Amino acid sequence: MAGIMAEPATVESAPAAGTRAEKVVIVMPAYNAARTIEETFRAIPAGYYDEIVVVDDHSRDDTVERARALNLKAIRHPHNVGYGGNQKTCYMEALRDGAMIVVMLHPDGQYDPAIIPEMVRPIHEGRADMVLGSRMMVPGAAKRGGMPRWKRVANRFLTTTENLAMGRAFTECHTGYRAYSRRFLETVPFLRNSNGFVFDTEVIFQAVHFGLPVVEVPVASRYFADASSVGFRQGVVYGLGTLGTAARFLLHRWGILSSDKFRP
């Protein structure tokens, strides 16, 4: 089983804006994030990004107005397309803007923006095309961060199942904190993926299928009242979708049933 490289959580070694050639774009898939987007933005380390793009999935609040007041590029969907559909817009917009590295940061404050330099560093150094911010790398960190017990159990079960299917040893496949190289986004057919939460699962299986290196870095888990979160019912649907993705991956790999998600 292939090992996963753990990265130390030190931000000093990451390249700042003036020392790198790659354009770094932070994308924020937003939905009803008006109360948290400014605090999240203020916590992003200066000098480690070139542009921030907020894609609002037809929020009921004034997320777009808050983003524009912060001088952020903001795009509003005319109707709600879902979490995965939102990410598709995020990544296509980042590619159009010339991004070489794209960081997905939720605007609800659930993930610590201070880790962005560490999310970018493995791609900058040519060691990864996908970086996952794992809440499960440090024992007990998810519990200390307030992740509900049922989510911790489900996370471990699904990640173990996915690892068995992929032949990998990821500590977490269900983080929403991610970074991608331009090569990744131009190689993986992510536009064919789900518009729902299972999008995040599909891109990991695609990374493995297309042989793109993945690195994990430890991140803190932060659950609080204003943080968006998948409820139990949505979690069941997501879990079934994850198992379905694993099955499609194996059927495609074994040559039994082809899937367009794993074709160039």
Where are each of the predicted segments found?
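Hydrophobic helical membrane-anchoring modules
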Residues: 1-19, 167, 191-264
